Structure formats: C-alpha cells, structure tokens
Amino acid sequence: MKEIKLSNAGGLSRRDALRRAAGAGALISLSPFAGFGVSSAEAAEEALGKFPKHPQWKFVFVNHVTTNPFWVPLRYGAEDACALFGTTFQWTGSEKSIATEMVDAFNTAVSGKADGIAVSLVDPSAFNDPVEKALAAGIPAVSYNADAKGNKRLCYIGQDLFQSGKALGQRIVEGVGEGQVAGFIATPGQLNIQPRMDGAREAIKESGKNIKLDEIATGPTVNEELSRIQAYYTGHPDIKGMFAVDAGSTEGVGKTMAANKLHEKGIHAGGFDLLPTTLDAISKGDLDFTIDQQPYLQGFYTVMVLFVYKISGGLSGLAEINTGLKFVTKGNVDPYLSTQSRFEGSSSEEKVLTRSGPIS
C-alpha cells in the first residue's frame, strides 16, 4: 500500500492541516464517559475530496446509549468522514436508552435546522412522527445501527440484525448440542438487539435440538450488565452456555466465564462486538467467539450518505448499507489484539495499517 502525501509550504500535509482543524477538539469528546450533546470541532472550510465548494453542513447523530464504549469506533468513523467531506457532526441522545430523551434530542435537531439527522431506531414507533416532521422540513433523516419497520427514514446503515442473530443461534447449536443456555440482552424489545435474540431463537428452533434459551435482561450500563450476569450464573450453575446480543453483555459474559473458570467446565460462550476485554477473553479461551458489525463503517457511511444526498440536491446518496458480520475466534483474534486503530476504537491515532500474505 502506497501512501501519497500532499505537501505545502508550511511543512504540514494538506490532510494533516485539515485533520488538525477538524479533529483537535473532537477527539476529546470521543471518551466513552463524555456527556452527550457534544459537537465535533469545526471542520476545515475545504474538504479533502474533489468536491465543489459547499456549506459546512452539520449532521446530528441521535443515539440511545451515548456513553457506551461500543460507540467509540463509530464516532471515529463519523469524524473521519466529516474531515474527508468538509462537514461536522453532533453526538446526542440518551445515556440509558430512554426513548423520550432521544425524541427530544431529535426534535431539537429539527428545530435547530440540522442539515441531516441520523438516528438509531431502537423503538418501533417513537420516532415515526419526528422523522416525518424532519422530512417535511426538508431535513434528510436516516437510521443507523437499528431500524424500525414502517418508519419513513430514507435508508438504513448497519448490520442485518435478525440474520446475525440466526448466525449466533447456529453457533449455539453447534457448540452446545442440548440443555439450557442463557441469552443476555441489555434492553429487551429494543430494535438494535432484540432482532438478534429473535434470530438466535429461530435458528435453535429450526435445528430441532433440545436447547432451551433463557432471555435475561441485563440493563443499559456496563456495571449493571456484569452484576446481573454474575447473579444469573450463581443461580444457574448447571447452565450449558452463556451468550449475549450486545457489547456490554458480551463483555460481562467473558468476565463471568473467567472469574468462575467456566470454560474448563465445558460451558460455551460468545456474543457480539469487539470491546478490548472481549477480544482478550477470546484470546484466553473464555469466549468462543464474538461477531463484528463494523461500527466504524456505520459512522463513516452514515456521514457519506447524508453528504452525497446534500451535495447532489437529493438526487443520489441514499442506499441500504449492510455493514456485515464476521466471527472473531481464537483462530483469527491475534491481529485485533496486536493492532491499535481507529477502525476498532482501540486508538485515536491516525495511521495507515498494512497487511501481508494471502487474503482468505
């Protein structure tokens, strides 16, 4: 891979100059413990791409758990896309998955005349009217990470959640065979994770195996999730498997497996997303696998879709984008552990990553 550098008289590359303008303040707001409602720093007037001069459009991301560490790579993706296209974004919503707080944030974006709004549609109907109001005001509204049938959002960027759940269920069938397994879910009913649980349940049913899947609510914060998972295992020591459909619960499963040496007892475990502790648990054998949904792309592509829609006058840009699923196991986890990058949210450093060897 060859990196082409654009130089200027001041010694900074054009990209570096733009990055310093666009990213200096934004990186601070990327802490998973930062409050919601934080804007990215103002981007440079000129975009990196070969685009006609355009206004510095501001896009608003409305999220359901704004301080959860899962979102760090998604926000890096949005930030990098903003630097590329000469736009800015604001991160707002709810810290604890409260739909009314998200609706308030969405309506504030509409009244503030945002240039585009992206919302995680975790509720089946709460955002129907707000989205229609945004569209009526000429503001493009798209969904990311979670989608809702019947909502008039213009497009969805994220994983096919039901199919990823079926893939999880198939792994459960392969690993467990029969018996009782736990399915941990942060917020039952919410559309960013409930479809995964439903997909897993369907796959287990289709297998015909004698496997009972218990759905266990863990809560919207990491500490709650770990506490409830540990408590569940204490009350169900004969469990055959422990699985989760969200990042925090997966992390909690890994910690519970390690604390009780459950892998040595033949208990299987797995879940979703690439939190550093989850990857470490896979490396140590406490988790069998995790499923990646590429949150960086969910942030990057969402900004890209809104930008192209704006710059084309609404003629182009809209696309249903599936950010895919990939199983990360002990056999392929090493590159994730040895590489620190914005793409996985493990580093804020901007750098080109290189690879070698055949692609499988």
Q: What is the meaning of each model-derived region?
A:
Residues 45-55, 192, 203-207, 301-360:
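Hinge/cleft segment of the Venus flytrap/periplasmic-binding protein
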Residues 124-163, 174, 180, 273-288, ...:
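Flexible loop/hinge segments that line or gate small-molecule binding clefts
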Residues 110, 172-177, 233, 302, ...:
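Short, hydrophobic alpha-helical segments
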